[in-house]
UniProtKB/Swiss-Prot annotation:
It comes from Pyrobaculum islandicum (strain DSM 4184 / JCM 9189 / GEO3). One of its GO terms (cellular component) is plasma membrane. Component of the A-type ATP synthase that produces ATP from ADP in the presence of a proton gradient across the membrane. The B chain is a regulatory subunit. Belongs to the ATPase alpha/beta chains family. The gene is atpB. One of its GO terms (molecular function) is proton-transporting ATP synthase activity, rotational mechanism. Keywords: ATP synthesis, Cell membrane, Hydrogen ion transport, Ion transport, Membrane, Transport. Has multiple subunits with at least A(3), B(3), C, D, E, F, H, I and proteolipid K(x). It comes from the Archaea. This is A-type ATP synthase subunit B. It is a peripheral membrane protein.
Length: 467
């Protein structure tokens, strides 16, 4: 049990999730303590601002019923640390790292600062090994790479929660399943969403290799800021100390940024773009940059954050700043979802900057780059022909153009679309890719190497298509 270093009874103000303490001396940024109200109930606090004779602390347990008068604050001279253990795998925690599954925490093997220790850029290793998610649109076109940070840009009402659950359930590093773990972090999610994730993880057995950190929308806003850091602290211990390949799925980073804006407003800071704090880019980087691989370390941390774009606006500060820090983005399309396609990826708007180095012979399959490049270029051309067909009519198109229309339909319905419980291997994904590409004439596949086309092209499919 921690011994208080200093106590203050000079709480000047309780403002939202924050308290202002006057006449402080020697209190440090990030220091933890507790505030005790007249009712005698202790609530954990963390210092987020230090002045010449004052300090501002966020109350992690919320300030409901906490008056300024009669409250005492104790500081311990330490930063917030998370007790970590391999036995956390299979557990469900709240945003503070406390049990949400009504079981005691396992004996700690170590205590880790929740703010983490940034990787020295010189010690970082370039990510080059793929993670198989079992989702064709990701594995085939925008492969997730071990050590990468690849966000999903979604919108309100789109099935990003289903995708998050499917990725947690299906993802694996081939050949090292026993060393693979998932850390799922729900940030500011509704009770209904939390029940969905808990039921899904337990029912499908995904929880056996996962740690779930669930912060609810009804929890204090300070916990919303803490939840991703708690999850990443557990991931860092599993990766750097125990050698696990850890996939961290965080949803929804928009809720995190809204919490950041609320805390910033409570502190009276000057707002930046659309009311968000000017340091939001730096703050997001402290989360996203905790992904990666390190020389001499067996494990890795891969981040798969999910955010909902307000009003589907990809230029909004949250997706805009996220795109600067991360290595690509997977964009969900409302139009595809309206056509009944799950997962509803916008193929043209999506990008994975590291995929090219993690696919091919010895990693996935020799034809992977050829399939990915050809599918994207052919689909882009097919969309242009679709627009043309709405103007002149399909009957007035040439036979090649009509082939592209058949290809686009098959690509969306057979390659992109798949079942929620359907898991496809890399080989199955690439085979489906060749099935839909073979609708086109062989001489149209100019983005694939001739020897690859000759080996994998299905001429019988080309001949069976009716125009």
């Amino acid at each position: 049990m921690l011994t208080p270093v200093v106590s203050y009874s000079t709480v000047r103000e309780v403002k939202g999730p924050l308290i202002v303490i006057e006449k402080t001396r020697g209190v440090s940024y990030g220091e933890i303590g507790e505030v005790i109200g007249p009712d005698g109930e202790p609530r954990k606090v963390q210092v987020i601002e230090v002045g010449t004779d004052y300090a501002i602390a966020q109350v992690l347990g919320g300030t409901l019923g906490l008056p300024a008068k009669g409250s005492t604050v104790r500081f311990y001279g330490k930063t917030l640390k998370m007790p970590v253990s391999e036995e956390l795998i299979g557990r469900i925690l709240d945003g503070k790292g406390q049990p949400r599954d009504h079981m005691p925490l396992p004996p700690p093997e170590d205590f880790r600062d929740v703010n983490g220790e940034p990787l020295n850029p010189y010690s970082r290793e370039y990510p080059e090994e793929p993670i198989e998610t079992g989702i064709s649109a990701i594995d085939g076109l925008y492969t997730l790479v071990r050590g990468q940070k690849l966000p999903i840009f979604s919108g309100t009402g789109l099935p990003h929660n289903m995708m998050a659950a499917q990725v947690v359930r299906q993802s694996t590093v081939r050949g090292s399943e026993e060393e693979f773990a998932v850390v799922f972090v729900g940030v500011g999610i509704k009770t209904e969403e939390a029940l969905f994730f808990m039921d899904e993880f337990r029912r499908t057995g995904a929880l056996r290799r996962a740690v779930a950190v669930l912060n609810l929308a009804s929890d204090p806003v300070a916990e919303r800021i803490l939840a991703p850091r708690v999850g990443l602290t557990i991931a860092e211990y599993l990766a750097w100390q125990l050698g696990y390949h850890v996939l961290v799925v965080i949803t929804d980073m928009t809720n995190y940024c809204e919490g950041l804006r609320e805390l910033s407003s409570g502190r009276g800071e000057l707002p930046g773009r659309r009311g968000y704090p000017g340091y939001m880019y730096t703050d997001l980087a402290t989360i996203y940059e905790r992904a990666g691989k390190a020389h001499g370390k067996k494990g890795s941390i891969t981040q798969f954050p999910i955010l909902t774009m307000p009003h589907d606006d990809i230029t909004h500060p949250i997706p805009d700043l996220t795109g600067y820090i991360t290595e690509g983005q997977l964009v969900l399309s409302r139009a595809m979802w309206g056509k009944g396609i799950y997962p509803p990826f916008d193929v043209i708007m999506s990008l994975s900057r590291l995929a090219k180095d993690a696919i091919g012979e010895g990693k996935t399959r020799e034809d992977h780059k050829d399939v990915a490049n050809t599918l994207i270029s052919a689909y882009s051309k097919a969309l242009e022909i679709r627009n043309l067909a709405t103007l002149v009519g399909e009957r007035n198109l040439g036979w090649r153009e009509r082939r592209y229309l058949r290809f686009a339909d098959a690509f969306e319905q057979k390659f992109i679309k798949q079942g929620y419980y359907e898991r496809r291997s890399f080989e199955e994904t690439l085979d489906i890719g060749w099935d839909v590409l073979s609708i086109l004439p062989e001489d149209e596949l100019t983005n694939a190497r001739p020897q690859i086309t000759q080996k994998f092209y299905r001429r019988h499919i080309f001949e069976s298509v009716k125009l």
